[in-house]
A protein has these predicted regions:
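Acceptor/aglycone-binding surface of glycosyltransferases and processive sugar-polymer synthases
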Residues: 38-40, 44-63, 68, 80-162, ...
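C-terminal, non-catalytic tails of nucleotide-sugar-dependent glycosyltransferases
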Residues: 206-220
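Cell-envelope/extracellular polymer assembly enzymes that use nucleotide-activated donors
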Residues: 13, 167
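Short, well-formed alpha-helical segments that are part of the catalytic scaffolds
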Residues: 1-7
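Short, conserved SAM-binding/catalytic segment
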Residues: 32-36
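Catalytic donor-sugar/metal-binding loop of nucleotide-sugar-dependent glycosyltransferases
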Residues: 132-133, 156-160, 169-185
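A conserved acidic beta->alpha catalytic loop
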Residues: 18-27, 76
């Protein structure tokens, strides 16, 4: 994954946030980082949740004054060859989102129908409740301008599951930043355990209503 990402643009650098992965990911990335100054890693002792991992990565990038900050899965679910399209799109936007459901089309591979219906329905639900003008609010392939992340009080971000993606896009949108979607094909890994759980689903169900209320009361 790392060589494929670095090959897309000479200015790209990589940060891997490792939550104590049992498969040795942290040690592998450490070895790569030791010989490649464009590769970096944050080690966390245990799994603290998707949202806090992204926040840690955002803070790291902001401290080092990167102009653009990407987030993406590290298992080829997100195709690194699409990165140049994100870089082109961000010239006219503030946040670029990779959309699995652009204009109502479904571009997902290796998901059972139950998971697909849950995800697709969740995005319709989130759009209806919050008014967020995107087809795919829960996707994790994004590019942010630095000033977007700087404008958001990262300490106040409450979501830690997939609702985190909705919350970050909603906060950016409510601040007047331009969101732009580009279609992607999401290929789910065929090995490993899904991070989806009842707790994550419950968080997403209620968080969109909190976001709606915060938006109405100017608290985002």
């Amino acid at each position: 994954m790392i060589p494929a990402v670095l090959a897309q643009d000479p200015s790209i650098e990589i940060l891997v946030v490792d939550d104590g992965s049992p498969d040795g990911t942290g040690a592998i990335v450490d070895a790569i980082a030791a010989i490649n100054p464009k590769v970096h890693v944050i080690h966390r002792a245990e799994k603290l949740g998707l949202g806090t991992a992204y926040i840690a990565g955002f803070r790291w990038a902001l401290e080092r004054k990167y102009d653009l900050v990407f987030e993406m899965d590290a298992d080829f679910s997100h195709n690194p060859e699409r990165l140049p399209e994100f870089l082109a799109a961000i010239r006219e936007a503030d946040v670029v989102l990779g959309s699995r459901y652009q204009d109502g089309h479904v571009n997902v591979v290796n998901w059972p129908m139950s998971r697909l219906f849950l995800s697709y329905g969740a995005n319709i639900y989130a759009r209806f409740v919050t008014g967020l003008p995107v087809f795919d609010a829960t996707g994790g392939f994004k590019c942010f301008r630095r000033n977007v992340l700087e404008s958001i009080d990262l300490n106040s971000v409450k979501s830690n599951g997939y609702a985190f993606q909705i919350e970050m896009s909603f906060r950016a949108w409510k601040r007047g930043f331009r969101l732009f979607e580009i279609p992607i094909i999401f290929v789910d890994r065929t090995e490993g355990v899904s991070k989806m759980s009842k707790k994550i689903v419950r968080e997403a169900i209620w968080m969109v209503w909190r976001l709606r209320w915060w938006g109405m009361t100017g608290r985002v």
